[in-house]
Amino acid sequence: MQLPEDATKRAPLALVSIILPVHNAEQWLDECLMSVLQQDFEGTMELSVFNDASKDKSRAIIEKWKVKLEDSGISVVIGGHDSPSPRGVGYSKNQAIAQSTGSYLCFLDSDDVMMPQRVRMQYEAAVQHPASIIGCQVRRDPPDSTERYTRWINQLTSDQLLTQVFTSHGPTVIMPTWFCSRAWFSHVGPFDEGGQGVPEDLLFFYEHLRKGGGVFRVDHSLLLYRYHLCAATHSVLEMTIWTHRVHFLEEQILPHWKSFTIWNAGKQGRKLYRSLTAASQHKVVAFCDIDKNKIRKGFYCHEDSQERPKPKVPILHFQAAQPPFVICVKLDLTGGEFEDNLKSLHLQEGRDFVHFS
């Protein structure tokens, strides 16, 4: 006997709830929802959709799939609003979670496609790692978009999932692949509901790490991850993310270091130095580089400083510099030259250096 919809919402029936925020996603939804139907997970599953003021045919597509999914044993909860403007991804995810019942949460973006094994394999990992965010490897569509970023997502070691959390790439397992227990989400969450321009995934990820959460990646490609200019990611300003990253670096790493060197005497390294608090700036003993012209100059003078005399920071060759380093050189861009230079120093990532590129 099928329970009426309101009873389904109350009863804790699902083991896994798939959390799907939707805003004007008509061109992707059929493929996305078909991938929910095709999951090979044998436990109970629920799809929780929150329609964030879509003005296209998204709602009709969701209603059509509700019938197909429920016929195959996947319960569907649909929430939403039709205000003139959307309330944002953070709000939509929080609403979809609040109306769902599953003990585990599997996050899905409406423009992505899950492989049939995704829920099963991530559920198995989540049971083993109850205080972790579980991610997975991805396949990019189109395949040649963001090649460096995709390699980074797929190839980080298990240690780097925790040491490379300060880079401009953001969370070391990407939000559309997240899977975790409801209990852990409740301990960390909810998502920031600031709306467009707020990196709600990054803020949640940082809070997760502050609370001692782990990061685990299932090393199978379980998601087709689409790249297109309408994606919500593009609405977040780079400077907003930069500010959050600097703050997190100053909170998590710099208190443990008496002094440090910034690796890159160019634009990015100087920008980081200028963004630091005065207390952190005083810990910077040098910049280092391989550029002979920068090294010949001898020092960087912080012209905007209110201090007198203005701070002058030496610029050294990287082999003459002292760790620990905050590295502001982009990875995977110099044909391996930078990586070889770093390797030649025999340092330990996380202890002797962190990447901030």
Curated annotation (Swiss-Prot):
Keyword Cytoplasm applies: yes
Annotated protein name in UniProt: Queuosine-tRNA galactosyltransferase
Family of the protein in this entry: Belongs to the glycosyltransferase 2 family.
Disulfide bond annotation, renumbered to this chain: none
The UniProt record lists the keyword Cytoplasm: yes
CDD domains from the UniProt entry: beta3GnTL1_like
Record's keyword terms, sorted: Cytoplasm, Glycosyltransferase, Transferase
Enzyme Commission identifier(s): 2.4.1.-
Primary gene name: B3gntl1
Alphabetized Pfam families for the sequence: Glycos_transf_2
Highest classification ranks of the organism: Eukaryota, Metazoa, Chordata, Craniata, Vertebrata
GO CC annotations, alphabetized: cytoplasm
Summary of the function given for this chain in its UniProt record: Glycosyltransferase that specifically catalyzes galactosylation of cytoplasmic tRNA(Tyr) modified with queuosine at position 34 (queuosine(34)). Galactosylates the cyclopentene hydroxyl group of queuosine(34) in tRNA(Tyr) to form galactosyl-queuosine(34). Mannosylation of queuosine(34) in tRNA(Tyr) is required to slow-down elongation at cognate codons UAC and suppress stop codon readthrough, thereby regulating protein translation.
Organism of origin: Rattus norvegicus
PANTHER family in the record: GLYCOSYLTRANSFERASE, UDP-GLCNAC:BETAGAL BETA-1,3-N-ACETYLGLUCOSAMINYLTRANSFERASE-LIKE PROTEIN 1
UniProt cross-references to InterPro entries, sorted A to Z: Glyco_trans_2-like (IPR001173), Nucleotide-diphossugar_trans (IPR029044)
Reactions this protein catalyses: queuosine(34) in tRNA(Tyr) + UDP-alpha-D-galactose = O-5''-beta-D-galactosylqueuosine(34) in tRNA(Tyr) + UDP + H(+)
GO molecular function list: tRNA-queuosine(34) galactosyltransferase activity
